[in-house]
Amino acid sequence: MKVKPSVKRICNKCRVIRRHGRVMVICTDPRHKQRQG
């Protein structure tokens, strides 16, 4: 899980979602997981 000030999709499988007011990227590749914070 990477924590970044700005989250972006890395590949086509990445999905930008909101959970509990946080913007997150979920993907089939675990290295692409990101959270804004």
Curated annotation (Swiss-Prot):
One of its GO terms (biological process) is translation. Belongs to the bacterial ribosomal protein bL36 family. Keywords: Ribonucleoprotein, Ribosomal protein. The keyword Ribosomal protein applies. InterPro entries: Ribosomal_bL36, Ribosomal_bL36_sp. One of its GO terms (cellular component) is ribonucleoprotein complex. This is Large ribosomal subunit protein bL36. The keyword Iron-sulfur does not apply. It comes from the Bacteria. GO terms for molecular function: structural constituent of ribosome. The lineage of its organism: Bacteria, Bacillati, Actinomycetota, Actinomycetes, Micromonosporales.
